[in-house]
Regions:
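A general secondary-structure boundary signal
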Residues: 15-17, 76, 128-131
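Catalytic core of nucleotide-sugar-dependent glycosyltransferases
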Residues: 47-54, 59-86, 109-121
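Membrane-interface aromatic/basic loop that binds lipid-linked glycans or pyrophosphate carriers
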Residues: 80, 101-146
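Amphipathic alpha-helical repeat scaffolds of TPR domains
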Residues: 90-103
């Protein structure tokens, strides 16, 4: 949630505005591009609280194919820019694998999407590692900070 985020307007004018064409993940791309323009300070403190219930619009939309396509744009952008370290990279690829297999779409399109993402190293091994790390963090009651 970026409701309390502050950035310099001059930096906004320096970024490409392709995020405005995205309907689901444009804010992700916006914040990535803004972060590339300067220093970022992070406060590791939960400042607001919200939860999603199964009937919320966010949960219903979450599995749609269009949103998946936008997420793939975001992740391939991050991977191409080499913004993530090796561990983050592997976990993010596991997350992408999970998103693809859980998205409600035709099996043939799902297989094609997975095949397309293999060139980025998105594999079932990455998926298993991401799931194991998430489960361990839940069992140990720790928040993974990458």
């Amino acid at each position: 949630n970026a409701s309390m985020t502050v950035f310099r307007k001059s930096k906004y004018h320096l970024i490409d505005k392709d995020f405005t064409a995205m309907h689901y993940c444009g804010d992700w791309l916006f914040w990535i591009k803004m972060a590339e323009k300067g220093d970022v300070a992070i406060l590791h403190k939960r400042l607001n609280r919200f939860r999603r219930h199964s009937q919320s619009v966010t949960v219903q939309i979450d599995r749609k194919e269009k949103q998946l396509a936008e997420k793939l744009i975001i992740f391939t952008y991050l991977w191409d820019k080499l913004i993530l370290n090796g561990f983050q990279l592997t976990l993010s690829k596991g997350y992408v694998y999970k998103e693809i297999i859980r998205t409600n779409m035709e099996e043939s399109r799902k297989k094609q999407t997975l095949a397309n993402m293999r060139k980025y190293g998105v594999t079932k091994k990455c998926y298993y590692l991401e799931r194991i790390i998430k489960t361990l963090c839940q069992i140990l009651h720790i928040k993974l900070r990458l």
